[in-house]
Every structure is written in structure tokens, then in C-alpha cells.
Amino acid sequence: MSLRRTSLTAIVTAALSAVLLTAATVGVAAAQSAVGASRASVPWNRVGAGWVLTQYTSAAPGGRTGPAGLYLISPTGTRYQLARWPNWQLAPQLVAWSPDGQRALFQVFSGQGGAEVLTLATGQVATFVMPGAATPIGFTTPRGLNIVAGQPSGSGTSLARYSLSGRLLQHLGYSADGQVLYAPSGTEFATGTSKGLKLVSNGGALIRNLPVHGMSANSCNPVRWWNSGTILASCVPTNTAIPQLWLVPVSGAHPTALTPRRTVSSGDLGDLDAWQLPSGLYLQAAGPCAVLQIFKQARNGSITLVTVPHTASDNRVLTAFGSRLLIQAPTSCTGSNSLLWFNPATHAEQWLIRAPHNVIGVAAAIPFYSRQNGNL
């Protein structure tokens, strides 16, 4: 688990606009009183692969206010509203979804700040500020029973593990990149170092360094688990600013490059993630003007741009499921974000949320825990 961050129908949009809360409090706790029926209708025993937890707002871009909601979306596109906030500017922001599907983690920016943990099935909320005002990063695996958070330390991040009420449990050491990739078992995690990655126990003890030679200092990020014994990492080679993908064995064996070094002329300004689908190897890549692109890589390393219809060509891949990619993408030039499943081989689309052009739309979307989940 890597730790970081069709339009709504008229009925849902009306519900968001009409059922606003008037309580002075903010955060998840301010959003629970009127959503029990929707929460009660969730088939919790079916929540798993293919489900998505989404925070959506009908506020207009540019710092304007407007309501927001938290939705659980099934693989068939059914939406269940779990929370709502009257003012997006004061709402906590979704950070993570626990691997067991039971809890959501938010970062609070209003008031004294801090973090909130929402139990999705009951609406129970814990709000707290972690020691040192640490910033929440995500949940531990396999069940999400602890929180990982970080504090600035030199040019990197000091990591620690906390209880679900914010109590400090264990210091986890220093990270060069501030990213944490937990093994599915929860016994160890990977994070960045000055020369590649390192594998660390859940108790904070170094297991082994995983160097990736020929890379710039402090440039390697653990992206996700490629298989049970290999980490997919994005690193920047020396004498360039264009990231490259590497397969890094946790055994300490020599890493191998998954993608070749790119040049600006290729149109790929850096490989950030990858998915092996039945139809081929697909890459998440940086593009011009800070957009995200999707490429298909051939066996010889050459690439072909994948165009996602009805989007504004800034396509963030959240996960892969079967033959499809889950994509968060703007659908207008004003920055309105939507959510869809897309099959890059057939170009078939299944829109989960298609936001109107004049709203922010999908502010955050987190797929149910999977080794395929991206970490951008």
C-alpha cells in the first residue's frame, strides 16, 4: 500500500445544494446527521475491488465556496453518500482509505488543523492533532489499524506511526521523499533514501538498503508493489530531469529498468507509474504544462500516446482493475474533474462522475486497496 494524496445526476446535485448543514462546527463531524439512510443502504459485505471512495464538491474553481460530499461508488456506478459539508473551503480533505475498507482518513485545515478518522459504516468520527502537528500520510496495512504521518526533517521527512486516535506509537525513521509503501502484510515498508530505497520494519528498524545506481540523489520514490517480491520505483537518472521506472527486488538483488531513459523529444517527460494489462504495458507519464499522460510501451521501449475521449488530456490513473484503468481527469479547461473507468484497448468508457464544467468536481478519489493502486 502506497501512502500519500458521468456528472452527478440532478438528484444528487440537488441533494448537495438543498440539504446544507447549519452547525458551526466543521469537519466530518459536521456532516453526519442527515446521511444515515444512504449509509445504511451500502452493501458493506460486497465492498472490495473495483469500489471507489470519492470526495466531490460543486464549488466553482478559483477559491469559491460550495457544498461537498463523500461518496462510495460501486463497480456498477451506484453512488452512496456517506457525508456532506456545507462549505468546501472548511471541509477536511480526503487523504486515505483503510485497506479493510472501514475507515477514511482526512486532513483538517480549518481551526487548529490536524486529522480526522471516519468509520464509514457508523459515521463515528475521531478528530485530533498528532504530536508535533504531524501531517497524515495514510493507513498501515493490512487492516488500517494505525496511521502513518510525517514531519519535516532537514530536506526530508521524519516518519512515525500513530493510533487511530492520534497517539504516538512508534518512530519509523527518516525518509528522503516522504513516501511510504507498506507491504500487504504490514510487517515492513519501503521509502526513499539518498541512493535509492530502503526496506524498514514496522518497528522502524532498517532491514536493508535497496540502492538504484546511476540515479540522482534523493530522487527515488517507491510507487507500488509490482509483485510480492518487487517494488516499482520512479527515479531520476543523473544528468537529466526525466524520471525512469525501475523494478527493485526487496531481496537486495540488482534492480532492472522497466522503461528506458526518455528524451524531451519523445513527448514523455518522465515515467511515474505503470500497469501491465492484458492488452499491454501502460505508463503514467509527466507531460507538458504539468499535465499527466498515458502511454503504451512496446517491448522495444517505444511509446504511443493513449488518448482518453471526452477529457482535457490530463489523465491521472488511480488504479487498474482487469482490463481497465480508473482515471481522474478534467473535462473542461476550467479544471472540472471527473471520474471514469477506461479500457485502453477498446476505448470503452464507464463514467462514474461527469462533473459540470463550472465546478471543481472530484477533489479526491481513492480506490479500494489493491497492489495496482497508483500513488500520485
Identify the role of each PLM range:
Residues 155-246:
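Solenoidal tandem-repeat scaffolds enriched in leucines and small polar residues
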Residues 74-91, 119-134, 163-177, 202-219, ...:
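Multi-bladed beta-propeller domains
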Residues 1-33:
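Secretory targeting and sorting signals
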Residues 32-81:
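An edge-strand/N-cap motif at the start of beta-rich repeat modules
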Residues 59-71, 112-117, 154-160, 194-199, ...:
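Structural motif
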Residues 40-43, 89-97, 132-140, 176-184, ...:
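Repeated scaffold domains used in trafficking and secretory/extracellular systems
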Residues 275, 289-376:
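Hydrophilic extracytoplasmic domains
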Residues 52, 104, 144-147, 189, ...:
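Hydrophobic beta-strand positions that form the internal "hydrophobic ladder"
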